[in-house]
Design a protein with these regions (language model features):
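Surface-exposed, charge/polar-rich loops and edge strands
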Residues: 46-65, 69, 76-80, 172-177, ...
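Short glycine-rich, flexible loops that bind phosphorylated cofactors or substrates
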Residues: 118, 185-186
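Short amphipathic alpha-helical segments and helix-helix/interface helices
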Residues: 122-126, 198-203
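N-terminal active-site beta-alpha-beta segment that forms phosphate/nucleotide-binding
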Residues: 33, 46-164, 168-172
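N-terminal, intrinsically disordered charge-dense segments
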Residues: 2-16, 45
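Charged helix-capping and loop-helix junction motifs
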Residues: 192-197
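Short hydrophobic alpha-helical segments enriched in small aliphatic residues
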Residues: 19-21, 53
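Polybasic, lysine-rich low-complexity intrinsically disordered segments
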Residues: 16-17, 24-27, 38
């Protein structure tokens, strides 16, 4: 049996041992906390920009997905139009365009070659042949340029299957651009064919009046899916109305 001094000495040694264990544990916890903070800081530094990009990318994907769905529905409606309806409603759109001061005063007008029952503006090419220079788009892999229209004999199908002029590229000023589209809304937002050719081209000609052209069923009263960066038309023309 231990004497009282021996028992006292043992108690002191045990107490010191527990104190040292507590100190080591505390130091270990501090080190772990510091290490975790350091890892978190490195993570933020490395991935914060990617997280921001992801937050921006997700809404973009959702909007583009909604645009694609709406585009498919309206394109199907347009493809089902009867030829006589295309002709009569296109004539009404042309009548609306001819009323516009910007068209009457324009010397150089860019329009498009219609496909899949788009509004057909080709009668303008013949009617104003001696008064205005008409330009048609020519598409490349990722870009679009314009060339003067010089009759059907000078037209050849491009890589998208759309007839294009074989005349020299035009680099001068354009007074008016008549823009095709699949869907528009009353705030003049536009959903195009999906290739982005017009978006890129129009962004380089912001000073030029840009007028969207469509049938009445292609015009939505409420906002269609769009990004803040998407360019709005200056005006949208339908067979029965003009939206400004």
């Amino acid at each position: 049996m231990l004497s009282e001094p021996e028992l006292s000495q043992l108690t002191i040694r045990s107490a010191k041992k527990h104190v040292n264990m507590y100190k080591n544990l505390r130091i270990s916890n501090i080190f772990c906390t510091f290490a975790a903070a350091k890892v978190k800081l490195i993570y933020i530094m490395l991935f914060e920009s990617q997280i921001h990009d992801l937050k921006m990318w997700l809404p973009w994907c959702r909007i583009r997905r909604e645009q694609s769905a709406l585009r498919a529905i309206v394109e199907q409606q347009r493809r089902m139009m009867k030829p006589e309806d295309v002709a009569s409603q296109s004539a009404q759109v042309i009548s609306q365009i001819e009323k516009m001061t910007v068209f009457r005063e324009a010397k150089t007008v860019m329009l498009y070659y219609p496909v899949h029952n788009e509004v057909d503006l080709r009668p303008l090419l013949e009617k104003y042949a001696g008064e205005k220079t008409f330009l048609l788009p020519v598409t490349h892999r990722r870009s679009m340029e314009v060339r003067p229209y010089d009759g059907e004999d000078m037209m050849r199908k491009g890589h998208l299957g759309v007839p294009e002029p074989q005349t020299p590229t035009y680099h001068g000023a354009i007074d008016l651009i008549l823009v095709p589209g699949v869907v528009f809304d009353n705030h003049r937002h536009r959903i195009g064919r999906g290739g982005g050719y017009y978006d890129r081209f129009l962004s380089k000609h912001k000073a030029t009046k840009q007028v969207g052209v469509c049938y009445s069923f292609q015009l939505r009263k409420h906002d269609i899916p769009h990004m803040f960066s998407d360019r709005r038309m200056d005006r949208v023309v339908t067979p029965l109305s003009t939206i400004e």
